[in-house]
Amino acid sequence: MKYKIVLDAGHGGSDSGNIGNGITEKEYSLLISNYIKERLDALGIENIVTRNTDRFLSDDDRVNIISSAFGNESNVIVLSNHLRNEDGEGLEVVYALRN
């Protein structure tokens, strides 16, 4: 099965996310998303990003971008972190183990 990956950098635009040491979560998530995209491109793995600049996306915007790119395909992986929790600390990585 060939995977298609959506890199969904959380936050953006007017939504900064959390701030630590003067750097916003939206900045980190965009940097990480763009880095992963470069690596996936180099490996020939099909992918899209929901945003590649500092702009706000609603949840509906994110869903529409994904649907426009891949429709209802079941082999899409979405990497995202835009939870609305102001008490969070640290880094979150979510992944699926599959056979």
What do these predicted ranges mean?
Residues 1-21:
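Catalytic-core environment of secreted peptidases
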Residues 2-4, 27-99:
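Active-site-proximal helix/loop segments of hydrolytic enzymes
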Residues 17-31:
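Glycine- and acidic-residue-enriched helix-capping/strand-helix junction motifs
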